[in-house]
């Protein structure tokens, strides 16, 4: 709230005034009437109809995001153990010491992620390049953070049990959100909304957030994202084929996929560079010269406004040296073969993709070739499209459907099993491949910081380490996870 006040005060200093608060103290405030005059546009007020996305307790959720806290982050060094909670009998369980605490550049933070996000504002405001979160999906069988009644660490020793009056299991600050709960979507929205607001402030201007979600809350995630980050910064959704066999959780349709919802902090600064080419794609670059491998792209416009009548200035002759294939805009004894952008099937006059000026400046990238069309020999012009331009390898735009076999979420379970030599440690872990695909889309650089505040099995941390090893980069991660007591019969506890 203080930051928002400072921003308004900087933009509209004449709207800053003083008033008396509930304690009788003189405090600075914003004069609403002056602010409305400065904005000088239509303002929706009171009960006037407007388009909005709202739910019960939304105002409290906004206040929760802005409310200050009196907590701090405590380091856990190599030779320390720190109590992080207690079971129903009051028996404490602890976090073990760090590894190379004074030299590591990565952080694993145990605590309520809402509080941690507020604490991170002090050091990481505007410094996080990428955020990935895999929040509770609100399936009716998972848990959401109960921020209003959540049990904080200092209260855990006083708790009398793991179930509330309605029989819902309580684990730390987590509460089961069943469909029988009349506040089913409301509770989930009140959990995620303040966290997204705080997450936005942590992102750098070119930062991006990726949110994994399924059909239960996909619509609400998009609406929330548009409100928090702005509709113009909604980069889209990727359908992730996570379960090729199909989920049996619904009676009518077996779902094969989940979603990856993407928002940028500022779309103009954000760069989604796409993915490196597959071997099949690279094989298209079958020609080579001193500059490297390339493919040939026809210079004639194939789609859109391709007719001469649409763009008459892009219809002009190009002359070709039949011995070398080199081109010129001027006809001569050397450049004697003429090429025109003629549509082959209809023989209509078309257009080139390049203007005369561009051909003059970059003609070294063009090549004339003899071709046969409609039984006759003629000449056409092609562009050399190189696999590597400068020091950048060619990439392909990220697609809206990811269905690679490696993205099957069963692989996440296999990866966890390979790390611990047994299964059952974590349920529904994301595969490292999913995060690696995301990192590749952004072409992460040295010192970029990746945040995951629903860390779970820490797949994101695993992926950052793997990415650094494979690319020789030095990206860093911050993982945040609420400490949870494992059931004594579970594989994770054993």
Regions found by a protein language model. Give the residues of each.
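DnaQ-like (DEDDh/DEDDy) 3′-5′ exonuclease domain used for proofreading
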Residues: 1-132, 137-194
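SAM-dependent methyltransferase catalytic-core segment centered on the flexible catalytic loop
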Residues: 127-208, 216, 232, 257, ...
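Active-site-adjacent "gating/activation" loops or surface patches in catalytic cores
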Residues: 153-168, 391-430
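Conserved class I S-adenosyl-L-methionine
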Residues: 447-456
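Active-site-adjacent helix-turn-beta-strand microarchitecture at beta-sheet edges
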Residues: 266-417
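Signature of N6-adenine DNA methyltransferases within the class I
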Residues: 192, 205-206, 215-282
């Amino acid at each position: 709230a203080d930051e928002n006040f400072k921003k308004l005060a900087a933009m509209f200093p004449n709207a800053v005034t003083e008033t008396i608060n509930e304690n009788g103290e003189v405090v600075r405030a914003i004069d609403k009437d002056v602010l409305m005059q400065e904005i000088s546009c239509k303002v929706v007020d009171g009960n006037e109809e407007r388009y909005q996305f709202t739910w019960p307790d939304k105002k409290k959720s906004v206040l929760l995001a802005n409310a200050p806290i009196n907590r701090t982050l405590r380091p856990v060094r190599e030779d320390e153990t720190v109590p992080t909670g207690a079971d129903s009998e009051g028996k404490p369980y602890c976090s073990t010491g760090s590894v190379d605490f004074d030299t590591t550049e990565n952080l694993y933070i145990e605590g309520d992620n809402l509080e941690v996000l507020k604490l991170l504002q002090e050091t990481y405001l505007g410094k996080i390049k990428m955020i990935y979160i895999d929040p509770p999906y609100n399936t009716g069988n998972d848990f959401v953070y109960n921020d209003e009644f959540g049990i904080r660490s200092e209260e855990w020793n006083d708790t009398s049990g793991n179930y509330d009056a309605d029989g819902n299991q309580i684990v730390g600050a987590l509460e089961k959100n069943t469909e029988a709960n009349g506040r089913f979507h409301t509770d989930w929205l009140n959990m995620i909304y303040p966290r997204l607001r705080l997450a936005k402030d942590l992102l750098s201007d070119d930062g991006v957030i990726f949110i994994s979600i399924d059909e239960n809350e996909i619509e609400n995630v998009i609406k929330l994202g548009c409100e928090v980050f702005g509709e113009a910064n909604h980069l889209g959704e990727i359908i992730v084929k996570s379960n090729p066999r199909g989920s049996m959780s619904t009676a009518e349709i077996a779902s094969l996929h989940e979603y990856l919802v993407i928002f940028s902090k500022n779309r103009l600064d954000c760069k989604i560079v796409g993915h490196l080419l597959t071997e099949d794609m690279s094989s298209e670059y079958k020609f080579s010269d001193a500059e490297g491998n390339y493919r040939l792209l026809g210079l004639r416009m194939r789609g859109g406004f391709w007719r001469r009548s649409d763009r008459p200035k892009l219809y002009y002759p190009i002359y070709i040296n039949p011995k070398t294939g080199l081109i010129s805009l001027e006809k001569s004894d050397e450049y004697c073969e003429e090429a025109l952008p003629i549509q082959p099937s209809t023989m209509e006059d078309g257009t080139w993709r390049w203007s005369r000026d561009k051909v003059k400046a970059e003609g070294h990238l063009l090549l004339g070739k003899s071709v046969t069309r409609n039984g006759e020999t003629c000449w056409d012009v092609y562009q050399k499209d190189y696999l590597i331009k400068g020091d950048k390898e060619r990439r392909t735009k990220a697609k809206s459907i990811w269905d690679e076999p490696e993205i099957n979420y069963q692989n996440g379970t296999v990866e966890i099993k390979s790390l611990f030599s047994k299964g059952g440690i974590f349920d529904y872990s994301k595969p490292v491949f999913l995060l690696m695909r995301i990192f590749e889309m952004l072409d992460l650089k040295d010192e970029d910081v990746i945040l995951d505040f629903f860390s779970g099995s820490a797949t994101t941390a695993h992926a950052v380490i793997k990415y650094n090893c494979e690319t020789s980069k030095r990206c860093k991660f911050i993982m945040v996870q609420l400490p949870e007591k494992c059931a004594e019969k579970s594989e994770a506890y054993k």
